[in-house]
């Protein structure tokens, strides 16, 4: 078993209209390795002018976590299979909508990996599909959520 953590910091910074919802949603995420990420609510979900559009929002981070976990397993399974991955780029997306329980959630995430291979042995499409299947089955993050994850290579 492993334990992971993050420190989330927010400051009202003197916002006088706090009771009316007019305060900044900008905050930061700090991680044990020293990384600090500028974060905010999505501008789509809060009053205009209260989000930091340059910050990562929780919905984006959720999609990135699923995508990153899948990629890491995929690359390792490819390596174990004798394949050489040169680059892996995924322009993943997610859909925020009301789910079957009538609660708003990221209900679907679509991964769109583009992979460049090198080396003497290149995987066939069925082998690539199997690598994606195994990566998805073993991804800790995908196994932790009820979101439907689709892979469109």
Where are the model-predicted features located?
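Extended beta-strand/beta-hairpin segments
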Residues: 1-64, 73-153
């Amino acid at each position: 078993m492993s334990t992971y953590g993050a420190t989330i910091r927010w400051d009202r910074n003197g916002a006088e209209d706090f009771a009316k919802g007019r305060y900044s949603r900008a905050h930061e995420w700090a991680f044990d390795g020293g990384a600090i990420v500028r974060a905010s609510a999505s501008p789509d979900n809060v009053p205009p002018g209260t989000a930091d559009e340059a910050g990562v929002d929780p919905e984006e981070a959720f999609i990135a976590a699923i995508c990153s976990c899948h990629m890491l397993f995929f690359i390792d399974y490819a390596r174990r299979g004798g394949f050489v991955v040169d680059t892996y780029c995924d322009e993943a997306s997610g859909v925020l909508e009301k789910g079957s329980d009538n609660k708003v959630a990221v209900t679907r995430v679509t991964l769109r990996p583009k992979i460049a291979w090198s080396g003497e042995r290149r995987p066939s499409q069925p082998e690539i599909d199997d690598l994606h299947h195994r990566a998805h089955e073993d991804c800790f993050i995908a196994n932790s959520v009820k979101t439907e994850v689709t892979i469109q290579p």
